[in-house]
Each structure stands twice: as C-alpha cells, then as structure tokens.
C-alpha cells in the first residue's frame, strides 16, 4: 500500500502543478470584449473531480439504503461550480441557494415521476447533501482563486496534504493515544501533532517561496497559523468522510486511485480545508 502511494502521490502532485501552471499562464481569458473570471483551468479540473466524487458518494449512499440520482447531482454540482466561478460577491449566495433549492425539488419530483414515495425524504436529502458537500466545498477553491494566484491554491492543497503525511508517519512511529478510535482507529493524538507541525513548516516555506516570486505575501506567524488551521480542517474533513464510510461499512470509497482508494479518499481533507483557506485570505 505504501509503495503504491509513493508512486501515485508524486503523479498527483505533478498533475496539480501542471494545472496550476496552466491556470496561472492563462490568467483571465477574454472573448472579444467579455473577460472571464480567472481560474478557468482550475474550474475544469474541479468539474472533473467533482463528477467522480459524486459518483462515489452516490454509491456509498446506496449502500446505506438511500436512493440518489447521480446524474441530477452531477448536473447540480457542475452548475454550482460554474456559478461560483463566474459569479460575484453579490450573486454567489443566490447561486448557492438557487442550486440547493432546485436540487431538492428536482429530487422530490424525480421520485414522484417514478411513482415512488417510500423514503423520498431521506433520498432527496442525500442528493441535496452530496450536492452541497462536493459542489459547495470545492466551490471555495474557485472563490479563493478570485483573491489569490493559482499557485496559492496549490500551496493550500500541499499544506493540507502535508498534515496527512506528517500524521501518518508520526502516528506509525510515535502513536500511542488514539484520537477518535470509533471513527478512525488508526489516527492518534501524536500523529495529529506531528501532522500539524509539518503543515505549519510547509506553510512557512510556501509563503516565503511565493513571496520571492511576487505573489501574495503573508508573515511567517500568519503562515504558521494558516498551516495549523488547514491541518486541523483537513483532519476534520478526513474524519467526517470516515464517519460516512463507517455508516456504509466500506473501507475505501472506490479503487480508482492505486494505493489511495477513491477520489473522495484523496479529496476528503481538502473539502473542509477549502472554506477555511478562503476565510483566512479574506
């Protein structure tokens, strides 16, 4: 498992860096007199990842006895992402509310058209929750792109994931006290501390590196705070997904990514880190 992760991890990082480089190189794309919002490459990768994540979550929901609509959910998530990417501060709230309300009623009426009434409340709630979980959280990366460069988006991802790496290796070597064993038996308090320390260090390194290239500069104390907050958010996101998987009695969301499980197994920590990063840079 570890050997596969050591191969898959660098490949995923390379893909991330290529997307970020492309996004930064493109900048705000213009069509005639119309200038699109920055982050069009980021939007593209978010839409692909979101679709895969929705399929996994819908499968997990099915395992818990809920009947979801994958195509409806994917459509709603993509509309939400596009709306947040191209919207403004004045319209974003309306976009989110409109998509959530539309998804809720569309799910209800999909059941009605299929002449199904049993479990309709739980099924519609699951469809709407997945839409908000994936689309709403990923959308914060697109909102963050309005305020910072694409390279800071990459930094947020790497800082968050560095906490996962630090927690894993520290926990394996020094872990003694279980963190929340009924949710994730492998996580330890010592691992969390080690992960947060590494995340803080990576945040300081990233802030210094990006500042040297003329990107948004933050002080090293703020970088430490950012690293700790992203690390905590990432671990909370990981544990949240573990809770959902325990309900469905599955270990991994799928086997899409060798050595790491499914898309949601990689994405889980980032989904909660995204809104935290957006708040930190406001």
Model-derived features: where do they sit?
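Membrane-embedded alpha-helical bundles of polytopic integral membrane proteins
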Residues: 1-229
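Hydrophobic alpha-helical transmembrane segments in multi-pass membrane proteins
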Residues: 195, 199-203, 234, 270-277
């Amino acid at each position: 498992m570890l050997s596969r992760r050591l191969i898959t991890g660098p490949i995923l990082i390379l893909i991330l860096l290529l997307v970020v480089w492309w996004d930064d190189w493109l900048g705000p794309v213009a069509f005639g007199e119309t200038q699109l919002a920055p982050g069009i490459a980021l939007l593209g990768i978010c839409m692909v990842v979101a679709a895969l994540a929705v399929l996994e979550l819908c499968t997990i929901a099915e395992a818990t006895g809920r009947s979801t609509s994958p195509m409806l959910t994917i459509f709603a998530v993509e509309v939400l992402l596009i709306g947040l990417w191209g919207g403004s501060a004045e319209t974003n709230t309306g976009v989110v509310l409109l998509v959530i309300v539309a998804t809720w009623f569309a799910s209800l009426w999909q059941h009605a058209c299929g002449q199904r009434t049993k479990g309709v409340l739980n099924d519609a709630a699951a469809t709407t929750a997945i839409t908000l979980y994936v689309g709403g959280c990923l959308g914060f990366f697109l909102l963050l792109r309005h305020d910072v460069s694409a390279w800071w988006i990459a930094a947020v991802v790497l800082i968050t994931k560095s906490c996962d790496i630090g927690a894993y290796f520290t926990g394996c070597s020094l872990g003694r006290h279980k963190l929340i064993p009924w949710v994730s038996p492998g996580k330890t308090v010592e691992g969390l501390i080690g992960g947060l320390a590494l995340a803080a260090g990576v945040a300081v390194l990233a802030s210094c590196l990006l500042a040297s290239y003329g990107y948004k500069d933050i002080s090293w104390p703020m970088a430490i705070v950012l690293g700790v907050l992203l690390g905590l958010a990432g671990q909370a996101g990981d544990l949240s997904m573990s809770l959902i998987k325990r309900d469905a009695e599955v270990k991994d969301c799928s086997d899409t990514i060798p050595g790491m499980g499914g898309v949601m197994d990689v994405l889980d920590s980032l989904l909660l880190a995204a809104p935290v990063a957006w708040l930190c840079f406001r």
